[in-house]
Amino acid sequence: MYAIIDIETTGGNASRERITEIAIYVHDGSQVIKEYSTLINPECKMPPFVARLTGITDEMLVHAPKFFEVARDIVEITEGCTFVAHNAAFDYSFVKQEFLNL
């Protein structure tokens, strides 16, 4: 099983920045069997450059769940799966840091 993950963030440093969106597709080797996607309130302002780049604005995030509110869903969906991402080191560092912040 593979958890194909894509995130958007407030910047490029996992120790200082936060996830603003996560999408997860669980693939069994033949097809996608689960999908999960949500905006995440980073509890900080979205830098204007990042908002222009991603299209994600403070207004979109204000009522989004905080990471601790979706953490259990993320664990349940990805448990037992191999983490796959386009830029895996970047995405994994942010997901790992968000869990460390809990």
Stretches found by the model and what they are:
Residues M1-L102:
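Conserved non-catalytic scaffold segment of RNase H-like nuclease domains
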